[in-house]
C-alpha cells in the first residue's frame, strides 16, 4: 500500500507526466485483457478452496480444474491483446504496449486465490514485501531519464510475474497434482461467469477512465490522474484487504453452517469499514494541499 508514497514522486520527476500517462494508459488496456483472463477466478477460486480446505483430495481437484480454465481464458485474452497490438495500437505506444503483454501473461500464473482460500496470508504478504522492495530498488537503479520508460514498464511487469512464480514453488505443500477432468471442470464456467459480472462493472470505472483520458486528451492528463488515484488507493487498499481476508473465512464458516459466527463477523466487518473509511477520507482531505506538490 505504501509503495506509491515511495516511488511515485521519483517516477513523476524522472518520467514526467507524459511518461506516467503512457504507462497508465497502456497498463489499463493490458489490465482489461488480464481481467478477462481471470474471469472471476480470484473470488470464485478463493471461495471454492476455502469451502474444501480441510480435505486435501477435494481441494487439489478444485484447484487444478479451476486453473485449467484460467489457462484457457488467459490464452484467449492474449490472442485478443495481440490483435490490439497489430491493428489498433498507436505506433508510438507499440513498444510499451508490447512489454505490457507480460501483464496479461501474469493472469495465467496468478494463484494468489489458492493461498487466500487456505488463509495462508503470511506467505503472500512476505512475498509481496520482498518482490516490491526489489522492484523499487530496480527503478531507482535503472530508471534515470524519460527514455527509460520501457525499463520502468518491464520492471513493474516482471516483478508481478516473478512474485506469482515464487508462489508456484510452494504449491506442492498444499496440493497434489490431479489431471483436470472435463466433467468436473465444465461446472465451474457458469459460476465463474456470474462472478465475472460484478468484476467487469468495477473495472469500468477503475480502468476505462484512464483509457478514455488517454484517447480523448493528451497523455499528460492521464499521468496526473494516475498519481491522484494512487494516493486514493492507499487507504482504499486497507478496506479491500479486509474483504480478501474475510472471504475465505466466511466461505469456510458457511460450509460448516456456523450461522452465529457469520453474523458476528459480518457486523464487525461493517463497523470497521464504515469507521475506518470515514477517518481515512477526512485524513486525505486534511493533508491534500501538502501532498499534491510531491505527486
Question: How would you describe each model-predicted region?
Answer:
Residues 1, 57, 102, 115-141, ...:
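Alpha-helical transmembrane segments of multi-pass membrane transporters/permeases
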Residues 45, 111-122, 137, 141-144, ...:
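C-terminal transmembrane helix end/exit motif
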